[in-house]
Design a protein with these regions (language model features):
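An N-terminal-biased, well-structured beta-alpha scaffold segment characteristic
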Residues: 1-80, 184, 207
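Alpha-helix C-terminal capping/helix-to-coil transition sites in glycosyltransferase folds
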Residues: 31-32, 53, 187-188, 213-216, ...
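Short, Asp-centered acidic motifs that coordinate Mg2+ and/or phosphate
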Residues: 34-35, 56, 191, 219, ...
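Short glycine-/small-residue-rich Rossmann-like dinucleotide-binding loops
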Residues: 41, 62, 190, 196-198, ...
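Beta-strand-loop-alpha-helix segment that lines the small-molecule cofactor/substrate pocket
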Residues: 52-55, 67-79, 194, 198-240
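Phosphate-binding beta-alpha-beta segment of Rossmann-like dinucleotide-binding domains, i.e.
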Residues: 83-134, 146-154
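Rossmann-like dinucleotide/phosphate-binding beta-alpha-beta segment
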Residues: 123-216
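Rossmann-like dinucleotide-binding domain for NAD(H)/NADP(H)
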Residues: 208, 217-308
Length: 308
């Protein structure tokens, strides 16, 4: 059995894969490939057709937006993912970003480093406490719920949620108040977190006049996927101070830089290069799980988390 490993995974997971499969790091002989394990590598219908023996695609992580799921389904190629392996690491990053932009941590560091702070506790570094604020969740999946748990237990936040796939009763059972629209949720929130997959329905979910509903002191975090928050509209909203600040760990063009987004021009924005799952523990869990599940499929068994 031959597995195409498109990107780096945890060394222990690779060793486990190499113990039972032939692992290739190149696409020189696609007709010999039985499985693909990927992180962000794009797999479309053309790739699938070149891999005539392809049986399974394993996603190292959660989001499958780089895989043509309809094409895989039409060709009888199974797709699986690891939906809970990185929950804690991404949730922790979300909490970190919220604290950072609420208290101007990165901004204070940069200004101090550059000699632009002339006295201690300067007024322009005045931030916002997270404790007791209202956290609005756009999407209430595993990651969002874990972030909410940390913030609720640690900071006493009140949690409200928007999720068209979750009933009012189910959301109340989570301890969240449900809102029926994104705009209503934003208007009721001091902190807005985006944790939904990128789909045609969620593309530009937060864009245009939606930014008019933000509280002036609110902060926004997107550690999900680029394209859910419209970056051009976010830039203008931040520049016009329609909200306090924003932080993104996901961008339309990745890795992000000042060359491909003007958001980095702003002092009330911080951006990280999709590092949500980049914790040793999460990488170990994701690697172990995706390897284990792909091997199961190649041995004729059903995976625990099948996407198609």
């Amino acid at each position: 059995m031959t597995v195409f490993l498109s990107e780096h995974i945890h060394p222990d997971a690779r060793k486990a894969l190499e113990a039972v499969c032939t692992v290739v790091d190149n696409f020189d002989h696609p007709d010999e490939i039985d499985a693909i394990i990927l992180r962000t590598f794009p797999v479309d219908a053309t790739i699938m057709d070149r891999c005539k023996n392809l049986k399974v695609i394993g996603k190292h992580g959660v989001g499958c937006n780089t895989i043509d799921l309809e094409a895989a389904k039409a060709r009888g190629i199974m797709v699986l993912n690891t939906p809970r392996a990185n929950t804690n690491s991404v949730a922790e990053l979300i909490v970190g970003l919220i604290l950072d932009i609420s208290r101007n941590i990165t901004l204070a560091h940069e200004k101090s480093r550059d000699g632009k702070i002339l006295k201690v506790a300067p007024a322009e570094m005045t931030g916002m406490e997270v404790s007791g604020k209202t956290l609005g969740l756009v999407g209430t999946g595993n990651i969002a719920r874990r972030a909410a748990e940390i913030l609720k237990n640690g900071f006493g936040v009140n949690v409200v949620g928007y999720d068209p796939f979750v009933t009012k009763e189910s959301m109340e059972a989570m301890g969240f108040q449900k809102y029926d629209t994104v705009k209503e949720l934003i208007a009721a929130s001091d902190i807005v977190n985006v944790s939904v997959p990128l789909t045609p329905a969620t593309k530009d979910l937060i864009s245009g006049d939606t930014f008019d509903y933000f509280r002036k002191n609110a902060v926004l975090v997107n550690a999900a996927r680029g394209g859910i928050v419209n970056e051009t509209d976010l830039y203008h909203a931040l520049k016009e101070e329609k909200l306090r600040a924003a932080a993104c760990d996901a961008f339309v063009t990745e890795p992000p830089s000042a060359a491909n987004t003007n958001l980095y021009e702003l002092e009330n924005f911080i951006g990280t290069p999709h590092i949500g799952a980049c914790a040793e523990e999460a990488l170990c869990r994701m690697g172990d799980e995706v390897v284990h599940e792909v091997i199961r499929v190649l041995n004729g068994e059903e995976p625990a988390h099948r996407v198609v």
